[in-house]
Structures are given as structure tokens and as C-alpha cells.
């Protein structure tokens, strides 16, 4: 059976690995998943990521913990295949009063809501992280 929403699968794998206190989680790689992993690393939510393999690339994400607790408290999919959420730059959501981030897919690439506001572009709100 084919995977309907690969990004939701990625977020679920990260959540499950953190609940099981794993240090690394692996999944099939895609351009979008690598872009989201890059944003998570830049924002300090994960320790690192690596793409391995040529024929079937695999994405390995190194999870981050602080004092035994996962750094990511909440990881939710916003836009989904059945109901896409596109927001203008003025309507981009703030997560928990600006403490968290929304990851947005824009015509200038995948970035945080803060970077999208600074660039003056809106786009599809992929997920929220806190």
C-alpha cells in the first residue's frame, strides 16, 4: 500500500521515537522531508540529520533531549492532503505566542513562519513545532 502523506509519517516517526527515547530515527527520504529536517535543525529542535543511500535514499534524524526530556514537546501536521492550508504573509500563525514555529512551504523554499514574514511571502503551513 502506498503512503498517502509522507510528511505526516515523518512527524509521527519522530514523535514515536521520542516517546521511546530513541537517539536516532530513520525513514525514507524525500526533498520535502530533508527541507523540513533542515529547518528543525536550524531552529534547534533536532541534533542533526543525514541522507544515506543512492538507489533508495534514507533520512536519519538525530533527536535532541534536554535533562532527559525531548526538546520537541508538540509536533502537529497543519496542512494535509485532504485539506490544504495556504496562508498569506499577514495570516501566518504564531505558535504559542511566538515560542514555537510554523514550518511553511513557500515559493522561496521551506522556512519558518518568522523567515517567511521577513521575506514577505506566504505559503502552505506544513506543520507546527513547540
UniProtKB/Swiss-Prot annotation:
**Listed GO CC annotations:** ribonucleoprotein complex; ribosome
Self-association state and partner proteins as the record states: Part of the 30S ribosomal subunit. Contacts proteins S5 and S12.
GO biological process: one example: translation
Identify the stretch annotated as signal peptide in this record.
none
- UniProt source species: Pseudomonas putida (strain ATCC 47054 / DSM 6125 / CFBP 8728 / NCIMB 11950 / KT2440)
Q: Which InterPro entries match?
A: Ribosomal_uS8 (IPR000630), Ribosomal_uS8_CS (IPR047863), Ribosomal_uS8_sf (IPR035987)
Which keywords appear in this protein's UniProt record, sorted alphabetically?
A: Ribonucleoprotein, Ribosomal protein, RNA-binding, rRNA-binding
HAMAP family attached here? Ribosomal_uS8_B
The domain of life for this entry's organism is Bacteria
Give the family per the record: Belongs to the universal ribosomal protein uS8 family.
Recorded hits in PANTHER family, A to Z, give:
40S RIBOSOMAL PROTEIN S15A
Query: What GO molecular function terms would the record report?
Result: rRNA binding; structural constituent of ribosome
Query: What does the record give as the function of this protein?
Result: One of the primary rRNA binding proteins, it binds directly to 16S rRNA central domain where it helps coordinate assembly of the platform of the 30S subunit.
One Pfam family of this chain: Ribosomal_S8
Protein name per the record: Small ribosomal subunit protein uS8
Gene name as annotated: rpsH
Amino acid at each position: 500500500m502506498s503512503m498517502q502523506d509522507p510528511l505526516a509519517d515523518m512527524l509521527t516517526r519522530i514523535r514515536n521515537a521520542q516517546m521511546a527515547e530513541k537517539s536516532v530515527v530513520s525513514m525514507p527520504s524525500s526533498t520535502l522531508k530533508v527541507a523540513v529536517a533542515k529547518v528543525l535543525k536550524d531552529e534547534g529542535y533536532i541534533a542533526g540529520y543525514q541522507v544515506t543511500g543512492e538507489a533508495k535514499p534514507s533520512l536519519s534524524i538525530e533527536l535532541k533531549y534536554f535533562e532527559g526530556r525531548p526538546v520537541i514537546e508538540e509536533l502537529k501536521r497543519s496542512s494535509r492532503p485532504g485539506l490544504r492550508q495556504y496562508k498569506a504573509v499577514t495570516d501566518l500563525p504564531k505558535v504559542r505566542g511566538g515560542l514555537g514555529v510554523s514550518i511553511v512551504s513557500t515559493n522561496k523554499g521551506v522556512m519558518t513562519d518568522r523567515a517567511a514574514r521577513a521575506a514577505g511571502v506566504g505559503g502552505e503551513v506544513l506543520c507546527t513545532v513547540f
